[in-house]
UniProtKB/Swiss-Prot annotation:
Family annotation (InterPro entries): Cys-tRNA-ligase, Cys-tRNA-synt_Ia_DALR, Cys-tRNA/MSH_ligase, CysS_C, Rossmann-like_a/b/a_fold, tRNA-synt_1_cat_dom, tRNAsynth_Ia_anticodon-bd
Cofactor binding mode and count: Binds 1 zinc ion per subunit.
Residue positions binding ATP: 269
EC number: 6.1.1.16
Compartments reported by the entry: Cytoplasm
Positions of short motif 'HIGH' region: 30-40
Short motif ('KMSKS' region): ranges: 266-270
UniProt record similarity statement: Belongs to the class-I aminoacyl-tRNA synthetase family.
Protein name: Cysteine--tRNA ligase
Domain of life: Bacteria
Recorded name of the encoding gene: cysS
Principal location listed in the UniProt entry: cytoplasm
Originating organism: Legionella pneumophila subsp. pneumophila (strain Philadelphia 1 / ATCC 33152 / DSM 7513)
Length: 456
């Protein structure tokens, strides 16, 4: 049975969906004012694998990942660039789609944008005003009054005083309490705005997600996810406003992905230590990046380094080598039940991908020993749930080399062929040894000599 670590209760719990066989999942997406960095990729890959696995187990999953396309940062960046907000957000949405496609991240079933749900947001704010959980401040903003929700802090597990002193709470004199947060911002000159019962303005960040999640999944759903940095204040505020409005639990399970770190610090645009997905893709194969992001449990911190990416590359080469020369699978062959069970046990333990990967390597070892099509097929199928090992092995094993390098290898193979024709075995063996020392293995067959990279 699937067990998930629920941030709300701080323990692993058996997963029971609201409606048997179906799952509603909402994950906070990106704010589109810049290129996605690897921290974003980690979260997106983690939830992508969760969705893939849940579907492989027969669940009908509705996966929602939003786009924040109106925000202070977006407005500021558009102003800096001298472009419209629509131009800016379109540019970075396209860039995000390119990144996710390269990393084999499946598109969500629904990808709502904040600007497309203004009326839904306004209606939710009206409910909160009617129930006495919100107020119109002196400056015209509509704010949520945290003191009206006694359970505030139940997700981050901090007391109210701790939240005030230990968080990035904006102190605004118009608020009744420092923890109160804006639901609707009164329009400022030159900023985008929409009409509302409280005048021209735009929605606050937190209310956008509550409104979009409930619009797509209903007032209650199964799983809400995002990066650990969103737990407070964003997710805490989502719970407060949503549950105050409906009187029901918002999401049953809260899942948070640990931070991607560089030298022990969170990778973040605000710190300036981030690596964009696009830049890393220039240096590393997409599957290598994906493997690296899954090499640590999703809740644990993960350190970015070239060494860790190199280790991911070597690991993938070993897996591709295992399936490279296996005879084709017959149509009536089934997956090996033993290895399926081992893999599922790992994934049922809160999506434990490091253990699942170890199962794949044990299986690859058996494939190497037996050359069994059934085991190789099982290996590819299980790895496919993690989103890799689906490329042509030859293509992957020769990837990452510049065309000039490939030409040099082919030239050396031709020289070796000539040396063998001349019975110059010493030269032929030396060429093979030189290439092997550079991680290139030659294979002589009936149709000629082929080459591939190997894990050094």
């Amino acid at each position: 049975m699937l067990h998930l670590y629920n941030s709300l209760t701080r323990k692993k719990e058996p997963f029971v969906s609201l409606k048997p066989g179906t799952i509603g999942m909402y994950v906070c997406g990106i704010t589109v004012y810049d290129h996605c960095h690897l921290g974003h990729a980690r979260s997106m890959v983690a939830f992508d694998v969760m969705v893939r696995y849940l579907r492989s187990q027969g669940f009908d999953v509705t996966y929602v990942r939003n786009i924040t396309d109106i925000d202070d940062k977006i407005i500021a960046r558009a102003s800096e660039r001298g472009v419209s907000i629509d131009e800016l957000t379109a540019q970075y949405i396209d860039a995000m789609n390119n990144d996710t496609h390269a990393l084999n991240i499946l598109p969500p079933d629904h990808e709502p944008r904040a600007t497309g749900h203004i009326e839904t947001i306004i209606r939710l704010i009206q409910r909160l005003l009617e129930k006495g959980n919100a107020y119109v401040s002196e400056n015209g903003d509509v704010c949520y009054e945290v003191d009206t929700f006694p359970e505030y802090g139940k997700l981050s597990h901090k007391d109210i005083e701790g939240l005030v002193s230990g968080s990035r709470v904006e102190i605004v004199k118009e608020k009744r309490s420092p923890l109160d947060f804006v639901l609707w911002k009164k329009a400022k000159p030159g900023e985008p705005s929409w009409p509302s019962p409280w005048g021209e303005g735009r929605p606050g960040w937190h209310i956008e997600c509550s409104a979009m999640a409930m619009h797509e999944l209903g007032e209650q759903f199964d799983i809400h996810g995002g990066g650990l940095d969103l737990q407070f204040p964003h997710h805490e505020n989502e719970i407060a406003q949503s549950e105050a409005a409906t009187g029901k639990p918002f999401a049953n399970y809260w899942l948070h992905v640990g931070m991607l770190q560089v030298n022990g610090e969170k990778m973040a645009k605000s710190i300036g230590n981030f690596y964009t997905i696009a830049d890393v893709l220039k240096e590393h194969h997409p599957e290598v990046i994906r493997y690296f992001l899954l090499s640590s449990h999703y809740r644990s911190p993960l350190n970015y380094s070239e060494e860790n990416l190199l280790n991911a590359k070597k690991a993938l080469i070993r897996l591709y080598q295992a399936v490279k020369d296996v005879p084709p699978q017959t149509e009536d062959s089934k997956l090996d039940e033993y290895w399926q069970v081992q893999f599922n046990q790992a994934m049922n333990d809160d999506f434990n991908t490091p253990v699942a990967l170890s199962v794949l390597f044990q299986l690859a070892h058996e494939v190497n020993k037996s050359n069994s099509p059934a085991l190789a097929h099982t290996l590819k199928n299980l790895a496919g749930i993690l989103g890799f090992l689906q490329k042509d092995p030859e293509s992957f094993l020769q990837s990452g080399l510049a065309e000039e390098e490939k030409l040099v290898i082919e030239q050396l193979i031709a020289e070796r062929l000539q040396a063998r024709a001349e019975r110059n075995w010493a030269k032929a063996d030396q060429i093979r040894a030189d290439l092997l020392s550079k991680g290139i293995e030659l294979e002589d067959g009936a149709t000629g000599t082929t080459w591939r990279r190997i894990a050094e």
